[in-house]
Structures are given as C-alpha cells and as structure tokens.
Amino acid sequence: MKIFDYENIQLIPNKCIVNSRSECDTTVTLGRHTFKMPIVPANMQTIINDSIAEFLAENGYFYIMHRFDGAARIPFVKKMKERQWISSISVGVKKEEYLFIEELAKQKLASDYITIDIAHGHSNSVIEMIQHIKTHLPETFVIAGNVGTPEAVRELENAGADATKVGIGPGKACITKIKTGFGTGGWQLAALRWCAKAARKPIIADGGIRTHGDIAKSIRFGATMVMIGSLFAGHEESSGETKIENGIAYKEYFGSASEFQKGEKKNIEGKKIWIQHKGSLKDTLIEMHQDLQSSISYAGGRDLEAIRKVDYVIVKNSIFNGDAI
C-alpha cells in the first residue's frame, strides 16, 4: 500500500472545458438532500453551534451539530423541523443515548441525519447503536465513525450505517496519535483511499485538512463529503473565547477529547490552540466555493465527478517546500 498524506500529493490538470470557473457545479448529494459543497464543519463545540447550524441549513450547506449539550438536542431538532430545514445531530454510545433515540422516536422527531461520534468507531458499541437507531428511526440517515481501515468501513456498513467517517487523530487539535501510538495522522489521505476502495456507501473524510486544495484531494481519493475543523475555527461566529495579543485577535479551538471540552483530566486525546481571528464565516465559505470551482476547472470537467478521475503524483517531501501554509 502506498503511504502519503495531503502535502505529498499534487493533482495533474486536464484541459479546461469551461469559459469561467463560475460554470462549475460543486453540489453533492448525501442521502435525500443535495448540498452546495462537499464540506461539513467538524461537530466540535468551538466549530458548530445553534446559530451557525441555522445559517448553514438555511443556505444549503450540510452541518452536524455536536453532542456535548445532550438536553438541547430535542429542542434543536424541533426547531429545525419547524423551519423546514434539515436536522443533523450527533450521539455517543452510552446508555442514556439509547434512551435519547427512543425519545426521538416517541415524539416522532426523526432527525434527517444522526452521526455516531466516537474516537474509535470500529467497535461493538457503535454497531449496536447503528442497529438501535435503524430499529427506532428507520428513515434517518446514519453516519458512523470514526474509523481508519477497510474492515471497519465494511463492518459498519453491514450493520446498517449509511455512511462512514474516516480519520483517527489527523486533526490539528487532536493528539490521539501522540497519546496512543495509533491513528491515521501523517497518512490520512492514504487511509481514505484504502477505505474508499472497500466502501459501497459514502465516506466522509475527517481531519487533516490544512488548505482548500485538500478538499479536492479528498474527493479524488474517494470522499463524498469532507469534514473540516481548524479551517472553520476562529471566525466571528465561532464559539469559544477571544483574546487579544500584541494587537491581534485570536479565538480558542479545542479538540473533542480535550480537558477543555471534558472538564476533567481523563482520557485526554485533544488539545486547545489559539487561531488568529478570520473574520466572517460567510467569506470563508465563498472562498472555499470559488477554490473548489477552480479545482473542477483544472480537472477538465464541470462538476465534482471530474476530480475523481484525474491523475496524480506523489511528491517525495512536501509540495510546500518549507513555505508556511
């Protein structure tokens, strides 16, 4: 198996067939809905909140609400359904989560999407939760993760998952690879390729995205959707504290298994970092959209499918040659 990551890959351009990149279609279908772009902000406390979820849903973007305010999820699903926007939430695998799924069913509040969100998703606990959701909410699109092997993808698909989330510890705020010695950090793109070859259902690439070009690379190697954390951190709309240092504004960004999220020093696999303030989330989404349209034009097509067919080269060291990203 070839081992590489985003910084080791360069996609090879084809003849451009559009007169303007604005002709390129970045839409993607996941389940019963079509979205503006194949991107989703990470379901982390400093990345997604109610107001951001509402903005994304209203404007045709996919989102996954985090699971760290359990009591707020039923009111959230109700609100999104009342506004006729998609509802997309996260669950864990503890006993109370089973009761939560049953309560959704009892109230006839089937969320459009439910993501089973644990660090090591290739486990009996995730398989049992997939089956529980499908029993009580059969119409819900279930995303299960996180995983890093073809065996895990197939097993979760066979259990009933409609999509799997690939990536163990490659994110900027994740230290799983350091704390445990395991994960896809440093070879996330190769792991995505490996898993995609076995997958029969959509894959969400999760983690390791450092540039907008990495979105196109994820699509090339099999992702239907790309989950992004650090690039969506630090915006005006983002949750988390703001601090000023030497006249420059920063916003906090922490991993989902950090002590800042957990509130305790136990099984820590995340850290807190400060991200320079980036301004408006809307501006970042516009730039991502334009860059992805450019990627499609370089691929020689009019839609995302063109990116899946391009050739690539593996660069020996890094495409950045020491330049700051």
Curated annotation (Swiss-Prot):
The keyword Transcription does not apply. It catalyses: IMP + NH4(+) + NADP(+) = GMP + NADPH + 2 H(+). It is an enzyme of class 1 (oxidoreductase). Keywords: NADP, Oxidoreductase. HAMAP family: GMP_reduct_type2. InterPro entries: Aldolase_TIM, GMP_reductase, GuaC_type_2, IMP_DH/GMP_Rdtase_CS, IMP_DH_GMPRt. Its EC number is 1.7.1.7. Catalyzes the irreversible NADPH-dependent deamination of GMP to IMP. It functions in the conversion of nucleobase, nucleoside and nucleotide derivatives of G to A nucleotides, and in maintaining the intracellular balance of A and G nucleotides. Belongs to the IMPDH/GMPR family. GuaC type 2 subfamily. PANTHER family: GMP REDUCTASE (PTHR43170:SF5). CDD domains: IMPDH. The keyword NAD does not apply. The gene is guaC. This is GMP reductase. The active site is at 174 (thioimidate intermediate). It comes from Helicobacter pylori (strain Shi470).
